[in-house]
Amino acid sequence: MLLSSAAALLLPSTSFDQPQKGWEPLLDKNLSKWRTYESYRHQNGYKGQQPVDAEGKPLTPIGYDKNEANVFSVVMEQGQPVLRISGEIYGCVFTKQDFKNYDLKLKVRWGKKKWTPRLNEPLDSGILYNSQGECGVDYWRSWMLAQEFQVSEYRDGNAMGDFWCIANSSADIHATHNTTENTLKFTPAAPLLTMGKEGRNFCQASANYESPNGEWTELELLNVNGQSVHLVNGHVVLAAENSGYLANGQRNPLTHGKIQLQSEAAEVFYKDIMIKPLAAMPAAYSKYFK
């Protein structure tokens, strides 16, 4: 069930309707601020269909808070907690709290392992924001309705900071058609295009600013009143506005929610996950929303 804007006003203080000073760390060694969801070990040939067993009977998703195969764990590096997502099973780790109007920072580094069905695909994960409802409503039957700040190695038209609609989400992005890769690309001076309709559900980041393999890449998400900015190592790579979701032919606001980190067939590490409230989108980024 989606939360209304009125309901958001009643959320705990970590929804940031009440301004707070400083940054709040979201990661500790016990994952005390997070829950987990696992769906399936997806196989080659998956095209959105219900997974079945050897007898053709529908498989039940693993579900919430099972953490089968220890997909989600915390390791300590130099005395600091680091979240490891093995990628073996599709799913997510998501915040217990609902957040609205914030600046989120975190660092990401790739591991070595890859899993079916993405053995020959780019390493992939993602930050899903404004996440509402139950997990499992998307194409991969693994995540909540949300907007995606893609976390991907730079390869085959994918990059850190790309945008995906998850499930029936929608947003407007200034974009042009990238003829080289036959997709949309964030271009601040271009007209606004609505994502989530007419087959448009993906937009490339404007450029690649990922750190060399094996090094940490700093990601930042500014998310205020339906506007969002994706930054990679301090560079703006995408901006989206009018965040919403489509239901019964109508577009509805999608401006707050939980934060999900994806398990998507690749080993990945996250650290220094911090969040702080924003009363408004910082003026330095207003030029992206004219």
For each predicted feature, which ranges?
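Bacterial Sec-dependent signal peptides at the C-terminal "C-region" and cleavage site
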Residues: S5-Q20
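Bacterial N-terminal signal peptides that target proteins for export
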Residues: M1-L3
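Carbohydrate-interacting regions of secretory-pathway proteins
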Residues: F16-K290
